[in-house]
C-alpha cells in the first residue's frame, strides 16, 4: 500500500522524532565525554540516528517514495545498536538501560507506523 503524500504528522510520528532525538543526544554526549579512542562509535551512532531521522521526517518529495525503506533502516539501526550494547562488556549502567528502553520503544513505534502507512 502506498503512502499518501499528504499524510499527517501525528502523535506516533512525533513519538518517533522525540525518541530518536533523545537516543541521538545520549550517544552524542557519551561520545563527547569519552576519550576519542573509545568515544567515536558513540558519535557515529548519534550521526546515524540524526541522518535517518531527517530522512524519515523531512517532507522532501524526492525522498517520499523511500520513506518505508528509511523506516526499516531506522528499525535495523536501533536493533543493531541494542544488540551491540548487549554484546559489550561493562556497559550496564542506568543510562544504558534507559537508552535501550528508548530504542526498543522506538522500534515498536516505527513498526506501528509502518503498519498504518
What are these model-predicted stretches?
Residues 1-117:
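Membrane-interface extramembranous regions
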Amino acid at each position: 500500500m502506498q503512502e499518501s503524500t499528504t499524510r499527517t504528522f501525528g502523535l506516533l510520528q512525533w513519538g518517533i522524532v522525540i525518541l530518536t532525538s533523545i537516543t541521538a543526544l545520549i550517544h552524542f554526549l557519551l561520545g563527547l565525554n569519552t576519550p576519542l579512542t573509545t568515544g567515536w562509535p558513540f558519535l557515529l551512532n548519534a550521526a546515524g540516528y540524526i541522518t535517518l531521522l531527517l530522512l524519515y521526517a523531512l517532507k522532501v518529495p524526492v525522498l517520499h517514495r523511500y520513506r518505508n525503506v528509511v523506516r526499516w533502516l531506522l528499525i535495523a539501526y536501533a536493533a543493531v545498536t541494542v544488540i551491540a550494547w548487549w554484546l559489550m562488556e561493562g556497559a550496564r549502567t542506568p543510562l544504558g538501560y534507559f537508552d535501550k528502553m528508548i530504542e526498543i520503544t522506538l522500534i515498536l513505534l516505527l513498526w506501528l507506523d509502518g503498519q498504518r502507512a
